[in-house]
Structures are given as C-alpha cells and as structure tokens.
C-alpha cells in the first residue's frame, strides 16, 4: 500500500512540476513579445531615419501604400514582414504614415486584442526616442515619459500604439 501511495504522490508532484515549468515558459514567451515589439520598432525607426530623413521629401513616402517597395529595400525587420504587409508580434497590422508636412513618421500597431495589458505596459516602457507615443487615449512625450503607473493606466489588451518620430 505504501508503494502505491508513494507512486501516486510522485506522479502528482511530477505533474505539478510540469505545470509550473509550462506556466513559467508561457510567461517568459509573453514577456518576450513586448521586448520584440520595442526592438523591431526601434530598428524600423533607425532604418526610416536613414532612408527618408535626409531626402528632399522627408517622410512623405513613409506610408502603408509603399510598404511593398520598402520591404524590397530591406526597411523592416524580417519577422515583421508577412507577404507584402507588416505585422507586430501579436499579429496586428502595422500601418505607416507621414505627418507634419513629411517631417515626421508615424507607426501604428497593437490594439487587436492579441496583447495582454502587461505586454502593453512592457512595450510602452521599452519604446524610446519618439516625439509622441499614444497608448490608447493617453499620449506620452519626452517631457512626460511613461512609467509603470501611467503606462498601466493607459494599457489594455485593446490599446493601440501610435508612435510619432522625427
């Protein structure tokens, strides 16, 4: 009887350990997505500055309509490209636009209910070097940067990010 009880306890403990490992892996993967967002958007901004800011038109051609041509030119991180479209790690479409007479670029992403509020906060805190960052209905800038509390208040699973850079 002791042998059977010992085996049952060992099996239960083994299953609990597997559940714990799976949960930790899932949380790590979810946090990783927010880091990928920050890395990809930062790389995109760097590439856009190199490809557009020095031209006579500024960011005028930095638009969703020109994504296919910019893919050909290697503008985007490869994991953002799906055919002739751009997506974020949560599977949402990424759109591009010019603002302020072509002197600024605008990147919109997120908002498709694929992100968690925690990922939203991590992404908001990880994004840097922008003119403005709108998260949902809250706008941040270089004199009003997000922190854990303000990003937490702005974030949700449906919050859209709109980042404007120069």
Name each model feature, range by range.
Residues 1-37:
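N-terminal single-pass transmembrane signal-anchor helix
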Residues 21, 40, 116-119:
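Generic detector of short, well-ordered, non-transmembrane alpha-helical segments enriched
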Residues 26-64, 68-69:
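Membrane-proximal N-terminal amphipathic helix
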Residues 53-166:
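Periplasmic/extracellular, small/polar-rich flexible segments of pilin-like filament-forming proteins
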């Amino acid at each position: 009887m002791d042998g059977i009880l010992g085996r049952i306890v060992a099996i239960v403990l083994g299953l609990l350990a597997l559940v714990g490992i799976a949960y930790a892996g899932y949380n790590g993967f979810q946090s990783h997505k927010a880091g990928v967002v920050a890395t990809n958007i930062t790389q995109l901004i760097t590439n856009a500055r190199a490809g557009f800011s020095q031209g006579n038109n500024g960011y005028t051609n930095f638009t969703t309509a020109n994504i296919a041509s910019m893919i050909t030119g290697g503008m985007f991180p490869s994991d953002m490209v799906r055919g002739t479209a751009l997506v974020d790690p949560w599977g949402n479409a990424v759109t591009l636009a010019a603002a302020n007479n072509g002197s600024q670029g605008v990147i919109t992403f997120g908002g498709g209910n694929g992100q968690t509020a925690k990922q939203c906060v991590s992404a908001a805190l990880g994004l840097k070097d922008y003119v403005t960052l709108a998260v949902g209905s809250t706008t941040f800038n270089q004199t009003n940067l997000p922190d854990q509390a303000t990003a937490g208040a702005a974030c949700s699973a449906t919050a859209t990010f709109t980042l404007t850079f120069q």
